Regions:
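Non-catalytic, topology-defining segments of multipass membrane proteins
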Residues: 1-142, 191-207
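Functionally important transmembrane alpha-helices
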Residues: 143-201
């Protein structure tokens, strides 16, 4: 059963990758595919894929997803709280000692362009930390959440990760992939993923 779920999730990720490529054909940089994976990177990718699958299984526990009348509010609440929680965590990963041992692996890629593959190319400890943050957020907000908002939030996070690392210029009123691309280029800016309230507050927002 777990193997079947793993295959389904991987197919879903491939679908998200294709969506990210269809949304925009405008690349932000000509310097794409500037890094070749080593054995350590491949091990990290495999570990992260398995960890994400186990986390998703734990998150839903085979429950039936029912749409609540509070779905829009719950989803917006999740997106904002997740962004505000993840940004300082991401900022902490850029501390010189933590960065050298953990986060540097993700920033080997200065011009990400392979969507999910480049998004997941990170140290296992970084992945575990991010999943623990996600689990903590769901646990805290669980009394007011519905399964549909949790499921759609996971989908949007995965899609956002694919878009942010696609190398493609995608933007709307509240979201620009260029922000995360600039983070990979310059480092100490744009630690948020979507709304950048944290970055605007501490002065690290760059566009």
């Amino acid at each position: 059963m777990l193997l079947l779920i793993f295959v389904i999730l991987r197919c879903g990720i491939l679908t998200l990758h294709q969506i990210s490529e269809m949304i925009s054909n405008k690349f932000m940089s000509l310097k794409t595919h500037d890094y070749k994976f080593d054995v350590g990177d491949s091990i990290c990718l495999c570990f992260n894929m398995i960890t994400e699958t186990c986390f998703t299984v734990w998150l839903f526990k085979y429950e039936i997803v029912v749409l609540s009348k509070f779905f829009p509010f719950n989803l917006l609440c999740l997106l904002i709280c997740d962004d505000l929680l993840y940004a300082p965590y991401h900022h902490t990963l850029h501390h010189k000692y933590i960065y050298h041992w953990i986060h540097f692996r993700h920033h080997k890629i200065s011009h990400p362009s392979k969507s999910y593959i480049h998004a997941s190319m990170e140290h296992p400890l970084e992945m575990i930390g991010a999943l623990l943050l996600h689990a903590s957020l769901i646990t805290i907000l669980h009394p007011i959440l519905d399964k549909a908002s949790i499921l759609f939030h996971v989908f949007l996070k995965a899609l956002g990760a694919c878009l942010n690392h696609s190398g493609r210029d995608v933007q709307c009123a509240i979201y620009k992939t260029k922000c995360h691309h600039m983070h990979h280029m310059y480092g100490m800016c744009n630690f948020s993923q979507y709304f950048f309230m944290y970055d605007r507050f501490i002065g690290t927002y760059k566009i």
